[in-house]
Amino acid sequence: YDTTGAIELTGNTNWNQSNHHLEAGKSYIIKNKFNGEINHTSGYLNGGRFTIFVEGEWTPSQNQIQSADIIILKGGKINTDSFTSFLIADNSILTIQSGGSLIGNNINLAAIGVLLKNFGTISVNSMKDLNTTSILYNAPKATINVTGKSVASWEQSVFTKGAIYNFGELTIQEGALKFNSQDATCYFYNGTEATINTPTFIIGGIGVNDGTVNAQKISNDNGGNPTFTNNCSLYAQNSFEFGGTSGTIIMNKGILAGGVENGTFIAIPSFKCGNSGSTFELNNGSMIKAEIMDIPNVTFKAAGTRSLIKSTKSISTGWTTKFNGNLDIECPEGEFAKGVPANNPNYIM
C-alpha cells in the first residue's frame, strides 16, 4: 500500500467537527498511538469513503466505524477492548495484513457493503452478528481465535447470515459457530487445507466444506432446511443431530466421522436424524461412520464409486428409511433394524 501523502492521526486529537473531520477520498495514517474521536458515521462524507492506514495502535473512541477503508499494516493493531461490542458499519472494508491484528470483545459486521479481509490475526471474544450480505474472508495462514466466554445460551459465539470464506484457521474455544446463509452467492465455505475448530457446528443454510471441521457436536439446531456439501473431513466427536429438517447433506469423497485416531477413522457415538425427511447423498467413496444410528424417514442415495455407511453398534430405521444406489451398509449382526419384522420392514432398499 502506498501511504504517501496520508495525513497523520496522533494522540487524542479529535477529528469529528464540522470544520475538522475525516474527508471522503482522503487518506490518513496512524503511525504511533491514536485514540481521538473521528466522524464515525457518513454525515460529512456525501456518499464517499475515507482511508485509514494503521501502522501503530488505534484504540477507537466510538463503538463503530462507517464508510471507511481501513488497512492494518504489518505490526499495526486495532484494539476495541474498551467496548462491549464494535460494529464495522455500512460501506466499509477492513483489511488486516500479515503481521497486523484486530483485538476486541464482540465484533459485528453490518449488512450493506461490508467486507472484513484477514491476512493476519483476529482475537476476539465473539462475532455474534455477521449480517446479511456481509463477508468475512480469512486467508491462508491467517488465524481467527474466538474465546466465546460468557456468551448467552440463546446466542452463538460466531453467527453469520452473510458469508464466511475460510482458507486459514478459525478456532472457537467455547460456544458455537452457526451459519444461516441462504444465498448461493453468499454462503459458508471452508477451503482446501483450511481448518475450523469449534465445540458446536450448526448447519443452518448453504455451505461447502473442502477442508476440515473439528467439532464436538454437529447439528442443524433442529430447524431450517440447509444444504451442506462435505467434500473432505467433517468430524463430530460426540454427536451428529440433523432433526426437524428436510435438508440435504451432500458428500463427494467426503468423510463424516468422530475423528481420526492412529490413522483410523473413529465412530461418532450418536448419529440422529429426526423423522422429517432429510436426505444424505454419498458419492464417490464417501463414508459415514457412527456407533448408534437413529435414522427414521431418512433417504440415503449413493452414486459413482461405492460409498459406505458403517455402524459399530446399531442402526434404527423408521417409516420409511430409504437406501439406494452404489452403497454398502455395515452393522453388527442382528443390530440392523432390530425388532422390525421381516415381513413388514420400515425401510426400503
Q: Where do the model's predicted regions map?
A:
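Extracellular beta-strand-rich, repetitive "passenger/adhesive" scaffolds
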Residues: 1-349
